[in-house]
Amino acid sequence: MTDQIYYETMYILRPDIAEEEVKNHIDKYNKLLEEFGATILDSQMRGKRRLAYQIAKHREGIYVQLSHQGDGQHIFKIEKAMRLSEDVIRYLTVKQEGPLPTPRSSNKSSNQAEKKENENIDSANKSEPKADETDNKKKITLESSTPELEEQVKS
């Protein structure tokens, strides 16, 4: 058996497709990957976004992200299916170093705890200066003479 490699495929669907059709496309490509021997790790619809440049006369597209694992033989087959589909205007598959990190939503509570801890540290650092620090410094006014200013600059 060959090694299982992690892949991420991002594809863009036409923006004028109905939401039900988008779900059908996602299910279709997920099933195709499973038929070709890949394991689907994650499938996310990223929503409709503005494209950086016009593709097939479209300024927007519906982004879908697939994370999958397989031996690599399934990549050609899934990309061929996307190439033949009129609803897919662009696709890209990249090889990943390893499995994707856990989604941010599951780490939400730990992230909130980190933010509170950072806020506490920031507030402690921003506290007002101590009384003895302010007493040592002499306030300089516009009426101050030049020798006093020079003395302050030197120290």
Swiss-Prot record:
The answer to whether keyword Flavoprotein applies is no
Family annotation (InterPro entries)? Ribosomal_bS6, Ribosomal_bS6_CS, Ribosomal_bS6_sf, Ribosomal_S6_plastid/chlpt, Transl_elong_EF1B/ribsomal_bS6
Q: Which Pfam families does the protein's record reference? A: Ribosomal_S6
Keywords from the UniProt entry: Ribonucleoprotein, Ribosomal protein, RNA-binding, rRNA-binding
GO molecular function terms here? small ribosomal subunit rRNA binding; structural constituent of ribosome
Q: Which PROSITE patterns match?
A: RIBOSOMAL_S6
Where in the sequence does UniProt note compositional bias of the Basic and acidic residues kind? Answer: 113-141
Q: Name one GO biological process term.
A: translation
Please give the SUPFAM superfamilies that the UniProt record associates with this protein: Ribosomal protein S6 (SSF54995)
Instruction: Give me the ranges of the annotated region Disordered.
Output: 94-155
Q: Which family does it belong to?
A: Belongs to the bacterial ribosomal protein bS6 family.
Q: What does the protein in this record do?
A: Binds together with bS18 to 16S ribosomal RNA.
- The name on file for this protein is Small ribosomal subunit protein bS6
What is the native source organism of this protein?
Prochlorococcus marinus (strain MIT 9515)
